[in-house]
Amino acid sequence: MDSASGTFVTEPTTTLNALFSAPGATATSWDDARNTLEAAELFWIATVRSDGRPHMTPLVAVWLDDALHFCTGESEQKAVNLRHNHSVILMTGCNQWDGGMDLVVEGQAVRVTDQHTLEKLAEAWTHKWDGSWDFEPGPDGFKGNGNETVLVFTLRPDKVFAFAKGPFSHTRHSF
């Protein structure tokens, strides 16, 4: 977010960290990083428990309107953690040493309760996974199995780190 105007920045400042990049490597473009976020089917989320211990788990997320969006059950550990600390990291990539790209997205998770936004997100989830994640908007999130509300969150990036492999490069996109 641009602190002077209070608006969200959608085109980041991009820098290459030469210390952790191969000689002659170039920065990963924001377009390449964003395309990878859009295509990713699985992410890992890191949150912080109230006692300061980290918590990490896999989940699905969608990139829409310049942000990542994810959901969780009200009683799941990540939801409990987000009640007291909105700082979050979402990561995606591959476990290969010499190919692909890993992305780390840092920011603050914000609850989504706006019906129009929930409708757009439910549609995005349905289309991304061929109906495997079929949500219906409810008053406070998505309607889950039974009576439990599925909480929906938006993560607008503060920073996105792109770790390209083959050749190696370490790029920082700052918003």
Over which residues does each language-model region extend?
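Structural motif corresponding to alpha-helix initiation and N-cap regions
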Residues: 30, 75-76
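Alpha-helix boundary recognition
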Residues: 37-38, 83-84, 126
